[in-house]
């Protein structure tokens, strides 16, 4: 029988049905059937490409067809009954009507008047299954008889609560307290009278149904039905095991119609679910919750599943325990009577015993049998073996080398048997203890295995090993790691942090395919006055080939004074050898070697992204751990990483929404993702590509598109190469002339002429305030958010327009985050109402106070709530005036992406309290408010490159990104442009006056900006250069006179050269993305700055290099850039397949290019072995080589 035809033939003629009596989920089921069987399976979450001979076995596909055939029968019957009632049809009280409806009952595949068998059903090939399953009276029991107050509701009459395992299979109370809706005797077929004593009579007065046998509940009556008779026939001891049977089937893990969960104590563990996951998946896919389904319909589903799991349940449930008195278990018989020569024979024997066809077993069933086989074999050989048998098997295609064994194997294990295990079992991975013959003590370790990562947990849920596909022999963990997840609770008594797994063993469940698992602690708060449960799920992400951890905390006593504060995943004991490294996402990214400690609040300059990595080195065969929060909405969180003596730890802390407030349930709204990645010295790059896959696919901030797709990134802005600022000092030390319009006009004109290129001016100290007296001027970091009018009044606008005519684009400074408590606006607009309040961990988060900040100016600030409408409007007013009144082309709004969020617990603020993603949405709304005033084409930029603001912010001042050294044990790596290249604009670094006196460090900073794709400069023109106010920690910033000196001619020419080269390579450096770096031989020499009163004193490399991919991914450029004015020669080696695996086995064309349009072809080379010899650099120049990938 063709399954497609079977499903299609069951659809009947539905066009005349009245579907008004069906609920939403039921109408979806019928409508999907009308579209055809494959459309229906798509609704079921199976997918449109399901075929019996591909990813589903024929047996599983028939199960789906039969289940949905039964569903359709039920729904059609309900709709037709509704149609009859609406046509004033007589009550269904005669045999003919009953027979008519009986023909529609769910399991009647043939003549309704005859007993139904499953002989024609290819699924019913288990022993003894050719027996009557359902009689018409049972169908009427499902549908209602039309004579009770509930009958008009049909299948929807019963209480839509969850199934009660202690009730009968179809029993359960109604919403009015009545028993299940059962037909009256007159609704039976002619032999119904013999069954009359089993049926309740309606009591119109009470609306309840009475029982005709004293005190016997409705579920006992059902044992006299044909269904119960079938169960008795199949299982003579059914009365004694019914409750256990029903309970077990509710716990069964159901995959495509085949049971593959094994009971606790044998080869797996159980999970508690009110309905089979098949039903959950079925209706979750169409957006319908199970409680909205008719309870009888759900129960019919589950009853059908129960019956077809029966034979499998006999096989799996408790069959590996010790023999019980009076009967021998399957496991005992296997050990005593059978010698299993190979896994194949074992599987064949099991299939023959239960009439299962080996070739049609689902993958999950094969894996389950493999696990059972190993248990049996292990018990038979345990007395002769010691240690632990560890079996690591690759994916179903066996793409990796068959490196299977680790540890001690049973002596009789044969090589051909192991190869059979690979073939039959596919991608499974598990450990079995072989040091005991006590089968009840066998505790299978939970092991999740993908083609890239194998993660092993012991019986307590502790991480015991973490290894990658490159070598199963390498364990990235130095020790077993327990207490890797913690929950921080607050009560009236104080704060408690519970770390798990600990001595409290969880209940656990492994999925059928062996790649997902769940740990549950019903109560983690022993010894406390609260009752809190925790569930952790690790699920395999197929796209990323990684594991995603999800957490759910339940408060079983919501009225108790207890609340949740934060959740933390802390992976300790990560092996980081001396030659290994770690990555932390500050700025563009920092690579650490050796001991270190780093932390950052996300989103901020200290944690611009949400991922870390650690490991690498020869001992790890280049592999490391990737840990990330794959959160596409930007929830507030905290990242921490450290390493001591070759052991690293990585942790992510999630501040929960409404932290400290009463709660019933809290689910982490994003997964924490962990995986093993390769990469060796460039471990950071491979980890970055995994994060890039997530970000491009799920992150909200990617929706604005690439640079050329955005209106707020005009062409002149992308093409800009050099930035200057009017004068800035890191400790707010300014002289009087730095922001004066007359001074700014004069010095900017001359610098523009000196560099002979367009540039952007970041203008500080432009504000005056309402008092025109110089002594009353609003100085830097005072009076925020009050700025206007500007210094010089209308003359400020005149200077702006004059400079813009000469090719200088003006970006005045404002602050978007802090509120001066001494400002006029704070006093006039109840400033405290618009500011954030912090809370110490406490129940109710009642202990609140303002965040207080102060900088070099001495003013006191509170942090404004970015979601506050007043704050958004006030900032938009200022930007409106600057653009539309004074003519600036862009505005710099400080701190938005640099400063850490200040979680807010103010009760009347319109966002979640404490945790949440409101910080991102608030800042995005600030920018939206500004754009409503100035239009979409004005660049609005801020400090630092925090990812979640990319869709709103036009560019980022990258001071923090370029703060680390470029080589050494704490070095900048361009992870951010490796992920987001082509989607953002970065500009700027801190340059000191000392850098111009010692020109090589300045040139190193400029070259770093160039090779990493940023716009150059941010040279500070004004500043205090002498006297007691000179900044001795950050260095002198006033550089104008030095730039204009003849002694700087060479360095000016070099900066101009790299600025022009950047414009020439914009299609790569701005619109493309950076790849893994090339290798230079010999390694460039390193040097330190002569002057040390600067933030980055080195070490600096004498040359830097990079590979950039074009946006169309058809070519790349290899850049080698000189820092020193002395000659240097290098050989360059590039393996493009490391970054672009699609180029494997490809030949590429390499040519040296120049910006004058001339190029010289070098050779055709393998993409994985590009060699360019004798690359000579002189006079701080660069060599550029274009690589064409070809067809």
UniProtKB/Swiss-Prot annotation:
Q: What is its EC number?
A: 3.2.1.-
Query: Which residue pairs form cystines in this protein?
Result: none
**Which InterPro entries does this one have?**
DUF6259
Q: Name one GO molecular function term.
A: hydrolase activity, acting on glycosyl bonds
Q: Where is the composition biased (Low complexity)?
A: 173-187
Region feature (Disordered): 173-221
Top-tier EC class:
hydrolase
Keywords (alphabetical) are: Glycosidase, Hydrolase
One Pfam family, short name: DUF6259
Family statement = Belongs to the glycoside hydrolase-like 3 (GHL3) family.
Instruction: Report what the protein is called.
Output: Putative glycoside hydrolase 22789
């Amino acid at each position: 029988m063709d399954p497609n035809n079977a499903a299609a033939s069951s659809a009947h003629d539905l066009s005349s049905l009245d579907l008004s009596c069906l609920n939403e989920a039921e109408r979806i089921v019928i409508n999907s059937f009308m579209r055809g069987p494959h459309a229906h399976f798509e609704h079921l979450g199976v997918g449109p490409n399901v075929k019996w001979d591909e990813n589903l076995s024929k047996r599983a596909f028939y199960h789906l067809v039969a289940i949905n055939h039964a569903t359709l029968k039920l729904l059609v019957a309900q709709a037709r009954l509704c149609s009859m009632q609406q046509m004033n049809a007589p009550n269904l009280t005669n045999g003919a009507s009953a027979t008519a409806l009986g023909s529609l009952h769910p399991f009647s595949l043939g003549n309704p008047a005859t007993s139904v068998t499953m002989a024609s059903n290819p699924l019913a090939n288990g022993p003894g299954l050719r027996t009557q399953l359902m009689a018409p009276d049972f169908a009427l029991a499902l549908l209602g008889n039309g004579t009770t107050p509930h009958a008009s509701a049909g299948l929807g009459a019963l209480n839509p609560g969850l199934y009660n395992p202690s009730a009968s299979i179809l029993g359960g109370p109604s919403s009015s307290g009545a028993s299940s809706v059962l037909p009256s005797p007159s609704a039976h077929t002619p032999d119904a009278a013999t069954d009359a004593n089993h049926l309740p009579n309606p009591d119109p007065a009470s609306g309840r149904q009475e029982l005709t046998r004293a005190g016997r509940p409705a579920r006992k009556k059902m044992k006299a039905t044909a269904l119960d008779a079938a169960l008795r026939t199949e299982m003579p001891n059914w009365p004694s095991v019914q409750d256990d049977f029903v309970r077990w089937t509710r716990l069964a893990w159901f995959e495509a119609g085949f049971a593959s969960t094994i009971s606790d104590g044998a080869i797996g563990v159980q999970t508690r679910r009110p309905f089979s996951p098949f039903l959950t998946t079925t209706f979750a896919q169409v957006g319908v919750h199970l409680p909205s389904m008719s309870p009888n319909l759900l129960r019919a589903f589950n009853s059908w599943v129960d019956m077809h799991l029966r034979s499998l349940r006999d096989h799996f449930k408790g069959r590996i325990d010790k023999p019980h008195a009076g009967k021998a278990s399957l496991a005992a018989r296997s050990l005593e009577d059978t010698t299993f020569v190979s896994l194949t024979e074992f599987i064949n024997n099991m299939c023959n015993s239960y009439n299962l066809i080996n070739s049609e077993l689902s993958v999950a069933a094969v894996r389950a049998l493999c696990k059972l086989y190993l248990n049996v074999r292990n018990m038979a050989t345990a007395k002769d073996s010691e240690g632990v048998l560890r079996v690591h098997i690759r994916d179903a295609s066996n793409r990796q080398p068959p490196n299977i064994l680790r540890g001690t194997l049973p002596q009789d294990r044969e090589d051909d048997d192991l190869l059979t295990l690979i073939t039959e079992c596919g991608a499974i991975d598990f450990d079995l203890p072989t040091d005991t013959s006590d089968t009840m003590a066998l505790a299978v370790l939970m092991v999740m295995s993908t083609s890239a990562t194998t993660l092993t947990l012991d019986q307590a849920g502790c991480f015991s090993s973490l290894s990658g596909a490159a070598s199963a022999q390498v364990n990235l963990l130095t020790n077993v790691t327990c207490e890797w997840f913690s929950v921080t609770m607050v009560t009236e008594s104080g704060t408690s942090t519970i770390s798990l797994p600990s001595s409290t063993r969880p209940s656990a469940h492994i999925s059928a395919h062996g790649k997902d698992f769940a740990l549950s602690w019903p109560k983690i708060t022993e010894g406390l006055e609260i009752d809190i449960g925790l569930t952790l799920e690790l699920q395999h992400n197929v796209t990323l080939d990684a594991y995603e951890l999800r957490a759910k905390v339940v408060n079983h006593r919501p009225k108790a004074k207890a609340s949740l504060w934060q959740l933390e995943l802390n992976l300790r004991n990560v092996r980081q050898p001396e030659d290994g490294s770690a990555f932390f996402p500050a700025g563009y990214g920092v690579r650490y070697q050796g001991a270190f400690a780093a932390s950052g609040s996300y989103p901020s300059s200290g944690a611009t992204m949400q991922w870390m990595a650690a490991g690498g080195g020869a001992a790890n065969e280049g592999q490391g751990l990737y840990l990330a929060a794959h959160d596409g909405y930007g929830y507030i969180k905290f990242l921490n990483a450290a390493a001591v003596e070759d052991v690293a730890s990585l942790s992510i802390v999630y501040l929960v929404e409404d932290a400290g407030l009463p709660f019933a349930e809290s689910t982490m709204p994003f997964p924490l993702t962990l995986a093993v990645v390769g990469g060796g010295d460039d471990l950071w790059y491979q980890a970055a590509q995994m994060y890039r896959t997530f970000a491009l696919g799920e992150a909200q901030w990617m929706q604005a598109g690439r640079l050329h797709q955005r209106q707020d990134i005009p062409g002149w802005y992308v093409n800009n190469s050099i930035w200057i600022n009017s004068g800035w000092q890191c400790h707010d030390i300014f002289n009087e002339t730095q922001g004066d319009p007359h001074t700014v006009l004069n010095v900017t004109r001359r610098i523009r002429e000196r560099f002979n290129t367009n540039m952007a001016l970041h203008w500080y100290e432009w504000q005056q305030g309402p008092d025109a007296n110089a002594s009353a001027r609003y100085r830097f970091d005072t009076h925020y958010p009050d700025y206007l009018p500007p210094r010089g009044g209308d003359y400020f606008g005149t200077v702006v327009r004059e400079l813009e005519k000469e090719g200088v684009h003006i970006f005045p400074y404002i602050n978007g985050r802090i509120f001066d408590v001494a400002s006029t606006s704070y006093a006039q607009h109840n400033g405290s109402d618009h500011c954030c309040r912090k809370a110490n961990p406490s129940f109710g988060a009642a202990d609140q106070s303002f965040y207080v900040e102060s900088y070099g100016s001495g003013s006191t600030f509170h942090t404004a709530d970015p979601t506050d409408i007043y704050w958004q409007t006030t900032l938009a007013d200022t930007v409106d005036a600057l653009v539309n009144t004074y003519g600036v082309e862009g505005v710099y709004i400080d701190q938005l992406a640099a400063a850490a969020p200040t979680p807010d617990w103010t009760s009347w603020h319109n966002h979640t309290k404490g945790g949440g993603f409101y910080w991102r949405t608030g800042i995005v709304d600030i920018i939206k408010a500004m754009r409503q005033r100035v239009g979409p084409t004005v660049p609005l930029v801020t400090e630092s490159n925090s990812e979640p603001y990319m869709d709103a912010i036009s560019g980022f001042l990258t001071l923090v990104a370029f703060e680390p050294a470029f080589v050494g044990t704490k070095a900048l790596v361009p992870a951010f442009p490796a992920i987001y290249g082509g989607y953002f604009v970065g500009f700027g670094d801190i340059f000191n006056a000392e850098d111009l006196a010692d020109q090589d460090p300045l040139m190193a900073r400029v070259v770093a900006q160039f090779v990493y794709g940023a716009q150059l400069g941010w040279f500070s023109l004004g500043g205090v250069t002498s006297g007691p106010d000179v900044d001795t920690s950050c260095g002198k910033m006033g550089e104008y006179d030095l730039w204009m000196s003849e002694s700087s001619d060479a360095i000016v020419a070099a900066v101009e050269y790299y600025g022009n080269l950047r414009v020439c390579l914009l299609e790569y450096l701005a619109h493309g993305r950076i790849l893994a770096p090339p290798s230079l031989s010999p390694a460039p020499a390193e040097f330190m700055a002569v002057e040390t009163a600067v933030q980055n004193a080195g070490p600096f490399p004498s040359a830097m290099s990079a590979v950039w991919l074009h946006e169309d991914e058809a070519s790349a450029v290899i850049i080698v850039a000189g820092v020193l004015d002395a000659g240097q020669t290098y050989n360059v080696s590039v393996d493009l397949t490391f970054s672009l695996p699609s180029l494997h086995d490809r030949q590429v064309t390499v040519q040296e290019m120049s910006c004058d349009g001339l190029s010289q072809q070098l050779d055709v080379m393998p993409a994985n072995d590009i060699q360019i010899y004798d690359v000579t650099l002189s006079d701080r120049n660069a060599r550029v080589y274009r690589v064409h990938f070809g067809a």
